[in-house]
Every structure is written in structure tokens, then in C-alpha cells.
Amino acid sequence: MIVRVCMGSSCHLKGSYEVVRRFQELQKKYNFKLYGSLCFGNCSQGVCVEIDGRLFSRVTPENAEEILKKVLQNG
């Protein structure tokens, strides 16, 4: 699984650094590669995260694990 967190200016201002830190913690529990990414073009819905090609919006440190679980369950 590949997780890409938007590091564009809008997502940065909305907390992308904290989301990255949460995903770094979750790497200990789940097997995935984590990358920073340029803008996904969905700035008003940030923080945006792409997981295996699927775009997720309004990602927070609090809902990051729930999103990972959904992707793992649904493929």
C-alpha cells in the first residue's frame, strides 16, 4: 500500500504535518509506504491523502487510522 500526503500550501496550513506524523506512527502497525506529495488539486477539501490511487479529503490525525482500515477492508 502506498500513502501520499499532500504537502501543498493549503494542506500544510490545514495540518498536513500532523497527518504525516500520525501516518508515521501507523506504519508500525500497518505495512505501507509513506510519501509527501505535491498538490492534488482539491485544496478546499484538505488535508488530502491518496492511498493506492484513491483520494481522501479532510484527513486528520484522528481519522487517519479509520481511513486506512477502510482501504484495507475494501481493497
Swiss-Prot record:
Molecular function terms from GO: 2 iron, 2 sulfur cluster binding; metal ion binding
Cofactor(s) demanded: [2Fe-2S] cluster
Gene3D superfamilies: Glutaredoxin
UniProt keyword annotation of ATP-binding present: no
Details of cofactor binding: Binds 1 [2Fe-2S] cluster.
Binding site for [2Fe-2S] cluster: C6, C11, C39, C43
One Pfam family it belongs to: 2Fe-2S_thioredx
InterPro entries cross-referenced by the UniProt entry: Thioredoxin-like_sf
Alphabetical UniProt keywords: 2Fe-2S, Iron, Iron-sulfur, Metal-binding
Temperature-dependent activity: Not very thermostable.
Function statement: Might be part of a multi-protein complex, possibly involved in metal cluster assembly.
Protein name according to UniProt: Protein TM_1420
